[in-house]
Amino acid sequence: MFYSIVAIFVGAGLGALLRWFLSLALNAFFPAVPLGTLASNLIGGYVIGVAAVVFTVRVGLPPEWRLFVITGFLGGLTTFSTYSVEVMTHALEGEFGWALAVAALHLTGSFALTALGMWTARAWLAAA
């Protein structure tokens, strides 16, 4: 149990730090669509696709690795709450086109990158 807690704790901290760094580095470029939040969610979508396949196929991996990557790191990296407030801020300011665009970018992008991550992992594992 102790190692599980540590794995989640460390993973979440690293994921949250990466999200913060991405926001610092990217959000100023295009304020209408905060690119740091988008990058965090898209990267998270890709990584969870890879992780879902790897942890399903490589059943011998210690369970703490799954907790570190999926529960911790990706839980800290991805952010539904920030995405929600960004979409609703546009909507409440009457910018319905931007609200819809931001929502669509996050949802379709994340699904597409999750599928790409799963495909990547399957191809990588098949070649190994």
Curated annotation (Swiss-Prot):
One of its GO terms (molecular function) is metal ion binding. It is a multi-pass membrane protein. It is found in: Cell inner membrane. One of its GO terms (biological process) is cellular detoxification of fluoride. Na(+) binds at residues 75, 78. The chain crosses the membrane at residues 5-25, 35-55, 67-87, 96-116. Its main location: membrane. Na(+) is not transported, but it plays an essential structural role and its presence is essential for fluoride channel function. The keyword Membrane applies. HAMAP family: FluC. Fluoride-specific ion channel. Important for reducing fluoride concentration in the cell, thus reducing its toxicity. This is Fluoride-specific ion channel FluC. The lineage of its organism: Bacteria, Pseudomonadati, Pseudomonadota, Betaproteobacteria, Burkholderiales.
